[in-house]
Curated annotation (Swiss-Prot):
GO cellular component: cytosol
Location of the protein in the cell: Cytoplasm
HAMAP family: RRF (MF_00040)
Keyword Cytoplasm among UniProt keywords: yes
Protein's name in the database: Ribosome-recycling factor
Matches recorded under InterPro entries: Ribosome_recyc_fac, Ribosome_recyc_fac_dom, RRF_sf
Gene Ontology molecular function terms on file: ribosomal large subunit binding
Record's signal peptide: none
Location (main, coarse): cytoplasm
BP GO annotations: cytoplasmic translational termination
Length: 187
């Protein structure tokens, strides 16, 4: 009989939380009908010879629910920031006002809303797969310990622990998806 098996559930939880954090980041980048500074996070500007995030070349503000402004610090970069936004695929048309770039956020049409809910669903599915992969790793550790002499009762206990953690995280993903889809479909 081997020594007492102790599954590192904290590690499994940390890895599952990482999948949730990644999902939230992906959800934040989805454009809903509301303005958000986080929608510009994936946009990179060719500044000073390297690709730089927009928030490092200017101040990003949300003065109104449907407006994002970027106060570019270096006047020479205004054109590059504008170009980066146009080419980003966000579907936003920047308007220049000196060193301030205004981004009016247009209303989403029904078709685009449906597309975005599908994209959100794909992001959620990726998160579920990541969580299930962590579950599989935990179950593999348990099976290995069983082969090394763990009792069947201990095996069942740890399998239940891992499954409960997985179920809890999958429910959190589903809840986050439901919230995001409602936010996207809100007119």
């Amino acid at each position: 009989m081997s020594e007492e098996f102790e599954l590192d559930t904290d590690d499994l939880k940390r890895r599952m939380d990482g999948a949730m954090a990644n999902l939230k980041t992906e959800f934040a980048s989805l454009r809903t009908g509301r303005a958000s500074a986080s929608m510009l996070e994936p946009v990179m500007v060719d500044a000073y010879g390297s690709m730089t995030p927009i928030n490092q070349v200017g101040t990003v503000n949300v003065p109104e629910p449907r407006m994002v402004t970027i106060n570019v610090w270096d006047k020479g970069l205004v054109g590059k920031v504008e170009k980066a936004i146009r080419e980003s695929g966000l579907g936003i048309n920047p308007q220049l006002n000196g060193t301030i770039i205004m981004l009016p956020i247009p209303e989403l049409n029904e078709e685009r809303r449906r597309e975005l809910t599908k994209v959100a669903g794909q992001y959620a599915e990726h998160a579920r797969v990541s969580i299930r992969n962590v579950r599989r790793d935990g179950m593999d550790q348990i099976k290995k310990a069983k082969a090394d002499g763990m009792s069947e009762d201990d095996q069942k206990f740890w399998e239940t622990e891992v499954q409960e953690l997985t179920d809890k995280m999958i429910k959190a993903v589903d809840a986050a998806l439901e919230t995001k889809q409602a936010e996207i479909m809100q007119v």
